[in-house]
């Protein structure tokens, strides 16, 4: 678990407007940006975060300020189990009862980024990661 924590901390400290650094951290190649209204989006099919295979990697950033960005990707099976708090300021959120299909997740402030660790319906299996820099 310590390695996973370090991998997330390292990734969240990379400036998201430095696409080469993100490609290196995720062992991938984010494609050229496509414009979606006021956002630019770069996509990669798969990569690695430490020992975890990741897929459906998306980097969405403000067209006028690429440092304001959200990086989101899925974790390919087999994943890892998050049974306990990782960072001191972590909060576990239950599924929303008013939202069908809603799943639990952990959230934490890591470096200057908001990190969300999405869980499967079993409340422990990591399914996706979202990192937002503002």
Range-by-range predicted roles:
Residues 106-130:
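Short, exposed beta-strand-loop hairpins at the edges of beta-sheets
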Residues 52-55, 68-70, 101-103, 110-114:
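Short, surface-exposed coil-to-beta transition loops
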Residues 50, 62-64, 99, 108, ...:
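Sterically constrained small-residue positions within well-ordered secondary structures
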Residues 1-93, 133-134:
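Short helix/turn-capping signatures at newly exposed starts of structured segments
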Residues 86-109:
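Short Gly/Thr-rich strand-loop-strand
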């Amino acid at each position: 678990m310590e390695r996973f924590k370090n991998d997330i901390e390292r990734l969240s400290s990379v400036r998201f407007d430095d696409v080469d650094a993100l490609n290196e951290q995720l062992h991938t190649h984010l494609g050229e940006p496509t414009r979606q209204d006021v956002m630019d989006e770069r996509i990669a099919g798969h990569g690695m975060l430490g020992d975890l295979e990741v897929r459906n990697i998306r980097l969405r950033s403000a067209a006028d300020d690429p440092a304001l960005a959200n990086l989101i990707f899925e974790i390919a099976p087999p994943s890892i189990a998050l049974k306990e708090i990782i960072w001191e300021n972590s909060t576990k959120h239950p599924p929303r009862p008013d939202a069908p299909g809603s799943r639990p997740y952990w959230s934490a402030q890591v470096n200057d980024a908001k990190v969300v660790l999405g869980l499967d319906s079993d409340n422990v299996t990591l399914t996706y990661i979202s990192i937002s820099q503002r």
